[in-house]
Amino acid sequence: MSIRYESVENLLTLIKDKKIKPSDVVKDIYDAIEETDPTIKSFLALDKENAIKKAQELDELQAKDQMDGKLFGIPMGIKDNIITNGLETTCASKMLEGFVPIYESTVMEKLHNENAVLIGKLNMDEFAMGGSTETSYFKKTVNPFDHKAVPGGSSGGSAAAVAAGLVPFSLGSDTGGSIRQPAAYCGVVGMKPTYGRVSRFGLVAFASSLDQIGPLTRNVKDNAIVLEAISGADANDSTSAPVDDVDFTSEIGKDIKGLKVALPKEYLGEGVADDVKEAVQNAVETLKSLGAVVEEVSLPNTKFGIPSYYVIASSEASSNLSRFDGIRYGYHSKEAHSLEELYKMSRSEGFGKEVKRRIFLGTFALSSGYYDAYYKKSQKVRTLIKNDFDKVFENYDVVVGPTAPTTAFNLGEEIDDPLTMYANDLLTTPVNLAGLPGISVPCGQSNGRPIGLQFIGKPFDEKTLYRVAYQYETQYNLHDVYEKL
């Protein structure tokens, strides 16, 4: 197997045993990117000079047996809405084209401290608004499993790069499914941690009460290793939780005999494709064969997840994106002749169609005549959705269901139909609204396109999610498929 398809865990062993140098790993990764990414189009910017320099420094530490760090010498790709000091961060928008931050996000500080090596920044939907990575101002990423298909979104570049063997792990952000849905479409493992588990300091805000950073990998244990490295409270993020337990790997191999798993009837209902239902039902039988107890339950407010999510997320986005005014940073229109024109033209020209749609939607929902009818009501629905989950978790350890209602759709198929695009978030948005952890793992393929299985857990119980996902992965995975793509 080429180094490019090795797992994080195996690469760490090879480096620690001095069978390979960090600089050799980094060289192999850049060779893979040069060969494959002109087709996949997952990267927006590469940090090659700094990566090679860092890898050579790690070579010297390796020679001295000073290999500190949980991710010593491991290459990584980072979604382009996560601030990287000295490296362009654009959110895939014309508005931030050429913007180079002068500070580091907390997750990047943590990863640098663990001696991971930054390879580059990954494509995404503009400002994380979209489900296909087609709203990017710069390029359209394709699905490594089928180049006619979308990789999902908004973390499409993060999922595609991992599936294509261009990095062993990446970071994405998940506001309504933006890690889990592309993970499902691209056949990789994607974790959306509990809200507050990972610091959001340095994540360009979309919807602050929903956003969460998480890892994408080709296997479950790698995912747990990366989440251990980036978790923890942060004084710079008042919403980060002071939870000390960040051990996700010690019990990962423990069996799931007697584990109580809930299967909501709504998750296999209207709107979910037959091939997805079949794959999930097969996965449920696999869980039973592993000793889990799977029972049907109801999450009655699931159907209200999409409307309440889009009102809340768009409302928060309209506020968060007001900072892009053409004055302090970002795109600045040269044609404006007054302050009002500068605001109007900079924002009209700098933002794409989908971002403007959500700003309008959010501004409308927050306006004085409609606040109670839309925003306030959506927050009440959010509470009902959370209560549904709380009730189920009184008797069950984990909830299971599809990650997305279909496999990846074709490029260009849904980009001009926002309601159809939004409907793809049916099974992921409730998890964000409730602030819960959710992980997507591959559970099948249909016409060559992967199908994702989602496990949802109690707050801060990522450990159980990793345990059940790891056991399921022993029975079904795509580990032998990636290299053939």
From Swiss-Prot:
Catalytic residues as annotated in Swiss-Prot or TrEMBL: K79, S154, S178
GO biological process, one term: translation
The protein's assembly and partners: Heterotrimer of A, B and C subunits.
Matches recorded under InterPro entries: Amidase (IPR000120), Amidase_CS (IPR020556), Amidase_dom (IPR023631), AS_sf (IPR036928), GatA (IPR004412)
One Pfam family named in its UniProt record: Amidase
E.C. designation(s): 6.3.5.7
Enzymatic class: ligase
Protein name: Glutamyl-tRNA(Gln) amidotransferase subunit A
Gene3D superfamilies in the cross-refs: Amidase signature (AS) domain
Family (UniProt): Belongs to the amidase family. GatA subfamily.
PROSITE patterns assigned: AMIDASES
GO terms assigned for molecular function: ATP binding; glutaminyl-tRNA synthase (glutamine-hydrolyzing) activity
Function: Allows the formation of correctly charged Gln-tRNA(Gln) through the transamidation of misacylated Glu-tRNA(Gln) in organisms which lack glutaminyl-tRNA synthetase. The reaction takes place in the presence of glutamine and ATP through an activated gamma-phospho-Glu-tRNA(Gln).
Domain of life: Bacteria
Organism (species): Staphylococcus aureus (strain MRSA252)
Keywords: ATP-binding, Ligase, Nucleotide-binding, Protein biosynthesis
One Gene Ontology CC term in the entry: glutamyl-tRNA(Gln) amidotransferase complex
Originating gene: gatA
Substrates-to-products reaction catalysed: L-glutamyl-tRNA(Gln) + L-glutamine + ATP + H2O = L-glutaminyl-tRNA(Gln) + L-glutamate + ADP + phosphate + H(+)
